[in-house]
């Protein structure tokens, strides 16, 4: 069953002319949620404004999801998105450049791909993660309004496995989280079986592990209904 979370969005501007409806995001990563395969199950999700991919899904899977949901998609690459798995295909648009900023349904998003792509193997690099974070920070991101952050690897100490090197979050991302305080940070990479909860709170930021799929409803200030899981 696809998980669901409601998040308050501090800027009322994107909700004008929506007649009280939330902005609905389908966030996916790492493995294809079986719910998305069956048309009847997809119908139960309801309309989606846009899709966010947080890495380690093939472009074929991403293209299928975007076509089946009938919504625009923005996504970044994970550590497994290399070689034949990442061959060019016409079924899906190109991945977002790391540290690129997008605008979807009136909401700003910034993505952070796995910071070690470019060769036959995706190596883990704290130095490159810091480089990503600093590039976004120098753009004065967040000064003109709130932003959704989406990455493959979570920030250090927020949805990660800090005792294991491979699934430990990046300290540069944690610095960026504390600097920007985005309302929402979406990520994958961390196996759901290894964590006690798929969502956490870091200051003003809701951090969500979207492995599989999560529907995120963004609500204007002071209008979030009770959250269902």
Predicted regions and their residues:
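Conserved catalytic scaffold of divalent metal-dependent phosphoesterases
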Residues: 28-35, 77-168
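Binuclear metal-dependent phosphoesterase catalytic core
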Residues: 2-22, 88, 101-108, 125, ...
